[in-house]
């Protein structure tokens, strides 16, 4: 069987792990089964463990343990998409304990992403401020906007709306 080293704590990195998890979720969605669901849930649980910063609840970063680099919107959005995929599968499987855990973490993550979003009147440092409204800054303390962060962030918000509409979130 294929092994996913990302589920091993020694090999876990929050920049790479979501891609493994999303591949497992896609495999499950395609085949309605996957022999790697334990790995998916382990990765999701490890991501949730990173949401421990009292100053930025919902952000996927902790200064305890290994240095995974500075937090950023791309990692936060991909981690949130991973939790959403895990919630969908946990719901399909009737795993209420995981559903509750993932819902709580997703709401925290959504609050974090929303806090990164530019509102009208907050974007005066840009040449065309109105074009930045709605975009997500790369980091809380950084005015930079990166396309991948905006695109993955938009996907998170769209996915959240679908989960809410379907009564899953």
Report residues per predicted region.
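Glycan-recognition and catalytic cores of secretory/periplasmic carbohydrate-active enzymes
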Residues: 1-169
């Amino acid at each position: 069987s294929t092994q996913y080293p990302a589920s091993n704590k020694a090999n876990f990195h929050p920049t790479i792990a979501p891609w493994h998890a999303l591949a497992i979720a896609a495999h499950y969605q395609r085949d309605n089964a996957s022999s790697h669901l334990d790995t998916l849930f382990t990765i999701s649980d490890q991501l949730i463990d990173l949401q421990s910063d009292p100053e930025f609840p919902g952000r996927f970063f902790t200064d305890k343990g290994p240095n995974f680099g500075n937090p950023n919107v791309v990692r936060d959005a991909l981690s949130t998409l991973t939790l959403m995929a895990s919630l969908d599968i946990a719901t399909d499987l009737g795993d209420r304990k995981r559903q509750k855990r993932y819902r709580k973490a997703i709401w925290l993550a959504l609050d974090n992403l929303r806090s990164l979003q530019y509102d009208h009147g907050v974007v005066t440092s840009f040449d065309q401020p109105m074009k930045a409204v709605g975009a997500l800054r790369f980091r809380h303390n950084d005015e930079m906007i990166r396309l991948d962060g905006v695109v993955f962030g938009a996907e998170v918000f769209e996915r959240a709306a679908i989960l809410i509409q379907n009564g899953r979130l």
